[in-house]
Amino acid sequence: MEDAEVAVVALGSTAGTARAAVDNMRSAGIKAGSVKVRVYRPFPAKEVFATLGNGRVKAVAVLDRSDALNNHAGPLCMDVTTALYQAGAHVPPSIALPHILNYIYGLGGRDIKPADIEKVFEDLHQVVQGQAASQPPTPPGMPLYENPMYLGVRE
């Protein structure tokens, strides 16, 4: 994470898959990183902000394994967003908070593959380059799209 411009946040074994994707993206020239949340409660908000709210990380994808039906993002994304927003209220304006994208994966017990996470990194890289897709970006530190995007779901 030392020089990462784009990062993914994941729980459990998905973090190992993300690490493999990070290695592939770094060999392709993209400054990628990953954050593994080891303990969910109490949520490590200070550590998340110290890692992602440093001004170097420009875009973050939060990988949730469950959907939140009454929220605009998954539970992990909501906690990461809250950690960045609350701590970000106390930082100088010169430090920009990253854009946040939320991805839901693993519905129906489907596995996530390194290629899926590499696609997420490509999306993040496009956001950093200012080429975000279909929906307009929201302010930094808030989820980038109104609804989460889904990985590995059959249509």
Q: Can you annotate each of these PLM segments?
A:
Residues 48-70:
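A structural-propensity feature for long, helix-poor, extended segments
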Residues 64-155:
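Peripheral docking tails and interdomain loops at the edges
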Residues 35-41, 102-107:
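Short beta->alpha junction loops
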Residues 24-33, 55, 87-96:
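Secondary-structure transition/capping motifs at alpha-helix termini
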Residues 12-14, 38, 66:
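Residue-level signal for short, function-critical loop segments
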Residues 2-30, 43-50:
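Redox- and metal-dependent alpha/beta enzyme cores, enriched for Fe-S-associated oxidoreductases
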Residues 12-20, 43-47, 55, 71, ...:
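Conserved active-site and cofactor/substrate-binding residues in soluble primary-metabolism enzymes
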